């Protein structure tokens, strides 16, 4: 059995621990309220999640939008379902288009792949929802049309995005209509996005992939010499997938299979079990050392092998075999930091949400533009910002994640889920934030499942992030003696203010208690909110 929760708190927190029969947790209060409204209208957890996701495209455009990708894990009361709603590259893409470049550009049309978030909303609504999409979209439409106050973190990220993307086609007209980024506390309106959301809801997504909006996206691409076409949009499809699972701490952790990085969490947890991690508290020097080394090994495998699963050299499950994980664990020196070869991950922006209802349905959902506002391309008169997920490809033709047409790139965004030892749902969770996501999932699992920390304490705890080589960035809230001890072991520790660049992710957790009600927790490093009823 997983360890019972400890409801004492050991860390400073800006957020209370919430408990109730229904729950929504995400990075923006207005979006959380949109989800809770659906539950109050008689909808279920999936209805709440879709409404929350659509609202997030409006109130947190610095991390996601209508032109994002999305992934989800759903517990329907009987079994788990995995959804991959990420898009593929334009069919006409090939490596020669990027000749002379060392990487796919991060901004502009050359980074744009087919957006999948809209298809994710529709697929979830059709399979699990109870309320019409027009109802689910209404809070988002109202926020976009009537305006919403820009929250503190979003105001900062908006300014940073404006500085980088203001000259990209359509960006300033949509997101800086007054010639500057909106300031914290100002009301921002996006009537074009309201119209697009309304059209998407009324047509059940068809307008985006085969109708008026698809035509506008393709025409704008053609006008700029880009490769995304109406056919690329029309050919998009979602995939319902079998989850990857790893037993851990008397329960199991569930992740979506590649093209995402969730498998790195499972690899690291499997390695740690071989190292006797249960003997070491996650704040102890030895616990931190082993966790860092296990994650470095997992990231090495992630960088070398993981891509669109249709293009991987072998099945992803091969990386999770006990024999393989034992061989990887044997490489860890329990007293000194080691060098493992892997690429330097890229920073990004994402939104995550979780919802649960009194019937027992739970959903873990994530969507993202990838890096902040994404490519910077905004389709005129639509409010649709397009993601830059294409820069997740590599240009090495021998790599399984090599750029090609009609192919999904490697993804950083991952929803997480955990089950107890009796096959019942334990928690839906996620830690948005690029390469922090798999690392954050592992840290949440260690703290909550293995050591029984309550979800808010686990979220508030100091975080660390492997970068490359022996470099590890830790939050400035880390104990100074612990930092010194890690340095003595050979770790190259960089101390960073958690609010400096927001690179330690944003966590949301909904934990199911044995009696069937929920404990909900939200990220104190973000503007988020957990709501219960």
Give names to the regions the model predicted.
Residues 58-75, 79-81, 227-229, 361-427, ...:
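Active-site rim segments in enzyme catalytic domains, especially the processed small/beta chain
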Residues 2, 274-369, 382, 389, ...:
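Internal maturation/activation junctions in enzymes
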Residues 254-262, 350-354, 366-377, 430-437:
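Glycine-rich phosphate/pyrophosphate-binding beta-alpha loops
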Residues 359, 407, 441, 450-501:
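Extended C-terminal subregions enriched in glycine
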């Amino acid at each position: 059995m997983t360890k019972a929760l400890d409801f004492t708190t050991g860390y400073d927190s800006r957020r209370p621990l919430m408990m109730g029969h229904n729950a929504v947790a995400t990075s923006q209060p207005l979006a959380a309220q949109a989800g809770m409204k659906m539950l109050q209208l008689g909808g279920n957890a999936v209805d709440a999640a879709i409404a929350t996701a659509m609202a997030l495209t409006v109130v947190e455009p610095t991390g996601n939008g209508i032109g994002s990708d999305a992934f989800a894990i759903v517990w329907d009361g009987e079994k788990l379902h995995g959804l991959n709603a990420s898009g593929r590259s334009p069919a006409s893409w090939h490596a020669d288009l990027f000749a002379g470049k060392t990487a796919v550009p991060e901004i502009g049309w050359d980074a744009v792949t087919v957006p999948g978030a809209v298809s994710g909303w529709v697929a979830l609504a059709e399979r699990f929802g109870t309320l019409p999409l027009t109802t689910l979209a209404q809070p988002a439409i109202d926020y976009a049309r009537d305006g919403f106050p820009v929250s503190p973190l979003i105001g900062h990220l908006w300014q940073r995005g404006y500085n980088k993307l203001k000259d990209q086609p359509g960006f300033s007209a949509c997101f800086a209509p007054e010639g500057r980024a909106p300031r914290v506390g100002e009301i921002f309106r996006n009537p074009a996005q309201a119209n697009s959301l309304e059209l998407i809801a009324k047509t059940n997504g068809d307008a985006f992939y085969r109708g008026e909006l698809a035509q506008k996206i393709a025409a704008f691409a053609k006008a700029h010499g880009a490769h995304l076409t109406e056919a690329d949009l029309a050919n998009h499809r979602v995939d319902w997938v079998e989850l990857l699972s790893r037993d851990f701490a008397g329960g199991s952790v569930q992740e979506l299979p590649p093209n995402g990085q969730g498998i790195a969490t499972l690899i690291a947890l499997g390695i740690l079990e071989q190292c006797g991690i249960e003997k070491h508290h996650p704040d102890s020097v030895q616990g931190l050392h082993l966790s860092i080394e296990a994650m470095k090994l997992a990231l090495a495998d992630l960088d070398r092998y993981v891509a669109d699963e249709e293009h991987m050299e072998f099945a992803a499950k091969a990386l999770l075999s006990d024999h393989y994980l034992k061989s990887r664990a044997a490489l860890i020196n329990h007293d000194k930091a080691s060098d493992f070869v892997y690429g330097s991950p890229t920073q990004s922006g994402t939104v995550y949400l979780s919802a649960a209802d009194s019937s027992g349905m739970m959903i873990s959902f994530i969507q993202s533009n990838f890096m902040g506002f994404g490519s910077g391309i905004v389709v005129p008169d639509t409010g649709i910002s397009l993601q830059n997920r294409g820069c997740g490809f590599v240009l090495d033709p021998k790599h399984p994640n090599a750029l090609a047409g009609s192919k999904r790139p490697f993804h950083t965004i991952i929803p997480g889920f955990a089950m107890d030892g009796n096959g019942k749902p334990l928690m839906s969770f996620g830690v948005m934030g690029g390469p922090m996501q798999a690392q954050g999932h592992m840290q949440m699992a260690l703290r909550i499942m293995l050591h029984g920390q309550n979800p808010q304490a686990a979220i508030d705890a100091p975080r660390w992030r492997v970068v490359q080589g022996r470099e590890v960035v830790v939050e400035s809230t880390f104990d100074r003696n612990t930092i010194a001890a890690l340095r003595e072991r050979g770790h190259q520790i960089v101390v960073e203010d958690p609010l400096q660049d927001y690179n330690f992710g944003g966590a949301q957790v909904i934990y199911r208690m044995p009696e069937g009600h929920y404990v909900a927790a939200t990220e104190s490093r973000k503007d988020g909110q957990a709501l219960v009823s």
